[in-house]
């Protein structure tokens, strides 16, 4: 089962990814984790990436694809894998295709921007414990304070509306075109193309997961 999840920030990809890797016993492949591991091991690709990062540059798609190919040779990928945060751009998607790294399913978790903003901007954190509340979906007993300690809750900078709108802007300009790319490829009838599915990201975690599993196992 070789999977990729697409969707905007706050669409619930991380939650569903955790459930999927547990169900199918496949690893979650993160380019960030791969970069850190390759640098720690001192592999040729890792050393190349380290030099670029230390000089403030962006790691090239060639290096990223090389890291992906290396990672997929590990025995834990024999049953498949789930891509996390990769590819991010059309150039990376084309590079993945050219490298003959095949996918079985690409799943878009679709959530309206305004709902994403409501989901994320409503989060409130009790910093010392890490407890998370939501002003609408999971409010504290008393507004603005932690249920257990009575200490104040904060809104992280990343959860502020202005920041979320910027992240959504980046998603729509860079990553959202991947939806069209994989959709058109699937519709082309190519044997190499993964199946493409769009599911609603609105509902409970279990409902969304059940919908994904139904798609994958039908």
From Swiss-Prot:
Monomer. The gene is adk. GO terms for cellular component: cytoplasm. ATP binds at residues 10-15, 123, 132-133, 203. GO terms for molecular function: adenylate kinase activity; ATP binding. Keywords: ATP-binding, Cytoplasm, Kinase, Nucleotide biosynthesis, Nucleotide-binding, Transferase. CDD domains: ADK. Residues 30-59 are annotated as: NMP. Its EC number is 2.7.4.3. Catalyzes the reversible transfer of the terminal phosphate group between ATP and AMP. Plays an important role in cellular energy homeostasis and in adenine nucleotide metabolism. The lineage of its organism: Bacteria, Pseudomonadati, Pseudomonadota, Gammaproteobacteria, Legionellales. One of its GO terms (biological process) is AMP salvage. Consists of three domains, a large central CORE domain and two small peripheral domains, NMPbind and LID, which undergo movements during catalysis. The LID domain closes over the site of phosphoryl transfer upon ATP binding. Assembling and dissambling the active center during each catalytic cycle provides an effective means to prevent ATP hydrolysis. Belongs to the adenylate kinase family. This is Adenylate kinase. It catalyses: AMP + ATP = 2 ADP. It is found in: Cytoplasm. Pathway: Purine metabolism; AMP biosynthesis via salvage pathway; AMP from ADP: step 1/1. Its main location: cytoplasm. AMP binds at residues 31, 36, 57-59, 85-88, 92, 156, 167. Residues 122-159 are annotated as: LID.
């Amino acid at each position: 089962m070789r999977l990729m999840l697409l969707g905007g920030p706050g669409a619930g990809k991380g939650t569903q990814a955790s459930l999927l890797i547990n169900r199918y016993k496949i690893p979650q492949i993160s380019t960030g984790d791969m970069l850190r591991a390759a640098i720690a091991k001192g592999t040729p690709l890792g050393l190349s990436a380290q030099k670029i990062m230390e000089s403030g540059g962006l790691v090239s798609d060639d290096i990223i694809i090389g890291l992906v190919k290396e990672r997929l040779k590990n025995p834990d990928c024999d049953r498949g894998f789930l891509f996390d945060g990769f590819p991010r751009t059309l150039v990376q998607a084309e590079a993945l295709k050219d490298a003959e790294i095949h996918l079985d399913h690409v799943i878009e978790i679709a959530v309206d921007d305004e709902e994403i903003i409501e989901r994320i901007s409503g989060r409130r954190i009790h910093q010392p414990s890490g407890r998370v509340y939501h002003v609408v979906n999971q409010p504290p007993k008393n507004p603005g304070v932690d249920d257990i300690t009575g200490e104040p809750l904060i809104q992280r900078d990343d959860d502020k509306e202005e920041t979320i709108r910027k992240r959504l802007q980046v998603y729509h300009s860079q990553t959202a075109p991947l939806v069209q790319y994989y959709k058109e490829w699937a519709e082309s009838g190519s044997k190499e193309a993964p199946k493409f599915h769009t599911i609603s990201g609105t509902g409970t975690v279990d409902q969304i997961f059940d919908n994904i599993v139904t798609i994958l196992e039908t």
